[in-house]
Amino acid sequence: MAGASLNSPESKESVLDFTFSPEEEAFRQEVVAFLEKEGPQEWHKKKVSFFDMSGQENWIAVHRDMSRKLGARGWLSLHWPREYGGQGLSPFYRLILREELARYHCPGYHSLSVDFVAPAILLKGSEELKKRHLPGIASGEIMWCEGLSEPGHGSDMAAIETYAREDGDSYVVNGQKIWTTYAHFAEWMFLLARTDRQAQPNYRGLTFFLVDMCTPGITVNPIINMAGHHDFNEVFFDDVRIPKENIVDSVNRGWYVAMSVLDSERTSDLGYAIAGTLLNDIVEGAREMDMLDSGDKIRMAELVAECEVARLIHYHVTCMQAQGKDTSYEAAMCKLLGFESIQNVAEFGLKVFRNYGLLSDTSPFAPLYGRISSCYLRSFGHSMEAGTSEIDRDIIAQRGLGLPRLR
């Protein structure tokens, strides 16, 4: 971004300039041209969103195919260091790519792999782990899932009980993870497990492992969400043996590895772009069906403003990331505003289309191919990713406003 930085330090009021550079605008046009030629045309026609993806026929194959195409162009590693196969570009190139993928209703960008695992390995992994795992992520060939949440603990990641016992040159893992997105087809998992039951505070006893999902002892059971789609899973570990060489950083340092990359995950999915695209589709569909009244127009204007605020905050955070600044509470604002915008827009769609908005994609009378009800139902679960909205508010209160913890 041409002015994606603070103005001169001499200025009393530093102003952020969100004008994209000619090179960035050229990249945007390159992405648009690529999607028009290589993107899944049926998905574009049906306006399939991030939240409808798993409800589509052959969606895993489409997702993987697009991921490989993005990887072949080097677009999954735009901001990685050149020495590890990246292009060394600013985070704004990733933002531009994600914006256009959302507008085109295109899958293929697997943020768990690109924006959580890859940064963790780049920041904390050994050279061997970098050589072994980064090429598969950059090419789009290898998909990852996350082993964080557990039954009974919810958002309290420090209370993880899944236990890894040292045994020779390996650790033997027993326990359970839940709400594990895409575990049913991912090749690898990044797993946070307890290696010290006596550690105080308890978060100091966690270790970050990389786990081959084909390892004996792993069982994956599906969890069908409210929309009837299969994204989530529960994963059981029964004497699963993980080589010590698959530890990121070192034993009992897993909490710090996870915390170092959570900001990247919180800013990866561009909730404002998903919400804005859905809002445009709702307005277009409602106009065709002549279902917009004056009250709807007022609410629509409010939602446009809400999405715009979320977008500008996201740009601000991306500026900070480009400068290497800490973005802990700003990233929480990005995720909170983005995903709550999606919920608000989907709720608006239900109001605009009335009973028709409740219809699923199996009904020929469903507006937008049933996306309204699907997005509404899915948005609540996805708002919990990378921390619930309550955790986001707590982070903003503590780190942004200097207030005590809310809980």
Model-derived features with residue positions:
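A short, Trp-centered hydrophobic/proline-enriched beta-strand micro-motif
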Residues: 140-148, 192
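Glycine-rich phosphate/cofactor-binding loops in nucleotide/flavin-utilizing enzymes
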Residues: 17, 28, 92, 96-100, ...
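C-terminal helix-coil-helix/basic helical segment that borders enzyme active sites and/or dimer interfaces
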Residues: 43-54, 287-294, 308-364
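A structural signal for short hydrophobic beta-strand segments in well-ordered beta-sheet cores
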Residues: 162-165
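A short core secondary-structure module
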Residues: 170, 174-221
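Amphipathic, small/basic residue-rich leader segments at the start of a protein or domain
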Residues: 2-111, 132-139, 268, 296-301, ...
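Glycine-rich beta->alpha junctions and the first turn(s) of the following alpha-helix
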Residues: 3, 18-20, 218-312, 382
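Internal helix-loop-helix
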Residues: 64-141, 182-188, 307, 321-329, ...
